[in-house]
Amino acid sequence: MKLSRKESVRRRHQRVRRKINGTAERPRLSVFRSNNHIYAQIIDDVAQHTLAAASTLEATLRGELESTATQEASAAVGKLVAQRALDKGIEQVVFDRGGNLYHGRVKALAEAARSAGLNF
């Protein structure tokens, strides 16, 4: 039986998470993508603590964006999460694509975070 798209994403995410882990020195930039929104968190897995977060649900972004499900919206979230991380002194991160392919909205978020100053 063929796997559903959701199950494929879940399995890929498990494979990715086995290989990467965020620390206090190099936390994990985790991306979750839904049909309408995108969420990014910077997580210290050792302390199990979220250090910075951003999403298209935030009021500051919603006013600026025409749609929350576009690459432009993802890029805005990437810039915002990078800005918040840099304000807290975080420059190095490990990228966790969350089981999604590195393409489209996930790629736009990653490239915007890189251009805003995060290294990964």
UniProtKB/Swiss-Prot annotation:
GO CC list: cytosolic large ribosomal subunit
NCBIfam families named in the record: L18_bact
GO biological process, one term: translation
Family recorded in the similarity comment: Belongs to the universal ribosomal protein uL18 family.
Tagged with keyword Isomerase: no
Chain spans, region Disordered: 1-23
An example Gene Ontology molecular-function term: 5S rRNA binding
Subunit composition and interactions: Part of the 50S ribosomal subunit; part of the 5S rRNA/L5/L18/L25 subcomplex. Contacts the 5S and 23S rRNAs.
Composition skew (Basic residues), residue ranges: 8-20
HAMAP family to which the protein is assigned, alphabetical: Ribosomal_uL18_B
Function description: This is one of the proteins that bind and probably mediate the attachment of the 5S RNA into the large ribosomal subunit, where it forms part of the central protuberance.
Protein name (database record): Large ribosomal subunit protein uL18
Database matches in InterPro entries: Ribosomal_uL18_bac-type, Ribosomal_uL18_bac/euk
Gene designation: rplR
Domain of life the protein comes from: Bacteria
